[in-house]
From Swiss-Prot:
This is Calpastatin. Isoform 2 is the major form in all tissues examined. Isoform 1 accounts for 5-10% in tissues such as skeletal muscle, liver and brain, and 30% in myoblasts. Isoforms 4 and 5 are testis-specific. Isoform 6 is highly expressed in heart and skeletal muscle with lower levels in liver, brain and testis. Isoform 7 is expressed at high levels in liver. Each of the four flexible inhibitory domains can inhibit one calcium-bound calpain molecule by occupying both sides of the active site. The lineage of its organism: Eukaryota, Metazoa, Chordata, Craniata, Vertebrata. Residues 12-21, 65-87, 441-453 have a biased composition (Low complexity). The gene is Cast. Residues 1-262, 289-493, 514-580, 620-788 are annotated as: Disordered. There is a cross-link at K112 (Glycyl lysine isopeptide (Lys-Gly) (interchain with G-Cter in SUMO2)). GO terms for biological process: protein catabolic process. It comes from Mus musculus.
Amino acid sequence: MSQPGPKPAASPRPSRGAAARHTQEHVNEKNIGSSSKPGEKKGSDEKKAASLGSSQPSRPHVGEAATATKVTASSAATSKSPSMSTTETKAIPVNKQLEGPDQKRPREQAVKTESKKPQSSEQPVVHEKKSKGGPKEGSEPKNLPKHTSSTGSKHAHKEKALSRSNEQMVSEKPSESKTKFQDVPSAGGESVAGGGTVATALDKVVGKKKEQKPFTPASPVQSTPSKPSDKSGMDAALDDLIDTLGGHEDTNRDDPPYTGPVVLDPMYSTYLEALGIKEGTIPPEYRKLLEKNEGITQPLPDSPKPMGTDQAIDALSSDFTCSSPTGKQSEKEKSTGEIFKAQSAGVTRSSVPPKEKKRKVEEEVINDQALQALSDSLGTRQPDPPSHVSQAEQVKEAKAKEERQEKCGEDEDTVPAEYRLKPAKDKDGKPLLPEPEETSKSLSESELIGELSADFDRSTYQDKPSTPAEKKSNDTSQTPPGETVPRASMCSIRSAPPKLASLKGVVPEDAVETLAGSLGTREADPEHEKTVEDKVKEKAKEEEHEKLGEKEETVPPDYRLEEVKDKDGKPLLPKESQEQLAPLSDDFLLDALSQDFSSPANISSLEFEDAKLSAAISEVVSQTPAPSTHAAAPLPGTEQKDKELDDALDELSDSLGQRPPDPDENKPLDDKVKEKIKPEHSEKLGERDDTIPPEYRHLLDNDGKDKPEKPPTKKTEKPDQDRDPIDALSEDLDSCPSTTETSKNTAKGKSKKTSSSKASKDGEKTKDSSKKTEEVSKPKAKEDARHS
């Protein structure tokens, strides 16, 4: 612990070995602090030093001068390097005070400083090492810090080893070092000066120790292992640098307390009961409903479960009970009934259940008691008789007999009385004899098919389809044996069935008929007569969906026709946009409509007399809807729909306005075709003189005397002017029935096209015929020329 007093100023440039010395001092303090009585050791050391000093008063002054120089050198070193260890500075004044008996003041000062210090916390081993290195310090004062740092590190390692082994050895060494150190005589004046310098150095070192002590950690030094004595200078320097860093500062700082306003949570939870959980929450109106029991679903009655195939068979075959044919089966049943006996029910007990399930345990105990009571009432189980069958005995196949069981209905005895056939009797009660059976004739394929297909809702069998098969059979019979038989006849012969052999025990047909009569008449199934199409129609139902605009309600408001009203709010009557047109004839309308269609030259086009009529016709053409052709006559119900649609279309067409004139509308179709297809002229043989062969030139010299006469051309039949143009246009359309007036117009237009195409075809035919006549005439002329 440091001496109280003013703190000395810290040196600006601490040496490199200061940290090492500081750690060494800290280690020495801890090692010596463990001793039980440090004060007693210190007193004994002082007594020994005093006795040694008194026993050697007569030493030469040379030694005193050497010691003085030593002390001054050491004091100078301490002033230069104030970071020296406190152990060295403290050891020097103690030794100097003990050198001479005349120097009392330094002793008193040293005693005061030692008394103010705590119990000895330094180890005097360092003084021994320093006394040995005294002459070196005197001769070489500049190298003092390095030497002291190296020696300090060595002593630190040695002291660690000694402190671990024994503490007594550590306490004995400072006494020996003091005796060795006090052998040197000291002078009076020099000792006083040395004591003053050492005291000042001691105060400085103590003040520095007081500053550096709280920053040095104690625990890491103790935990470091012992290092080897022969350490390099670099390692020592690194150790010194590491020691200068100091310990870790405490970074755990407490957070500042919160000084803001108090935070409160005003939220709270409340439980709301749902309506109807308790009777008190039910409203009075709903209680009346609950008392009436209205709207409460009652459990459905148990619906009969669907029957399986086995159950259905058992239900149907319940009436067909058979009497036992023999008494053997009853004996077997008795024997088997004696074998089976009542067996005691096995009691199964489970492990002990947990404590929580007490109610279930009581129920299980009750069930076990009931089962035990029932099992006791049944009695004990009798042991089975031992089987004496030996293993060597084996069942032989010869002893195992096969028994045939008669089925119900095979014999007359097994048939129940209700289902037995009663023989037909006469009036007298005698049974009627059965009629002799006719020999079955061989049936053809067609007859067999007709009999088999009688049940499949078809017409009764007819004998007409059997005629070709009979003819084929006749043809095969007429063929001689040497000729080959065709394949068709062979098939007909092979397909004939063989004669049915009369089987014994077969039920006669009369019995089958009587059984069928007992069943009753079959009820007519309404679905049986329906065709397959009707069944499909029942599943797929046709639903009519209203289209947008069919009714006024479905028309959007933006597209509805708004009625024009007067100032008073009355609807205005539609004004006649144009003057009423005179009724037009059919011929006039046909000519006006067929103006754009190319027509043959036979039909003369009518000229319009007035401009008003032409304008009226153009409006009629623009306003009328496009004609639609119908292949068949429509149903009577659709005519009204068509009229309604026509009226709606007329109203829409009126709202569109007048149609702008089309410049290409009045052009004929021939011009359009000619624009696309350009005719090319090809020279034919004989058109020029150069192209005529020399063989035929002499014919030209005869001036056409030998030319054959041209056949008379057919005169084109001109229709009478009085003929109706409608009949002329509709000659080829007699087969197609006309449904409406609009279809007539389109048919007439088409007939014009067909007539024009036919006229052009007729013209081509005439050309071909003329060419053929020319070709025929040419070889005839050649033959005449050869004969001549």
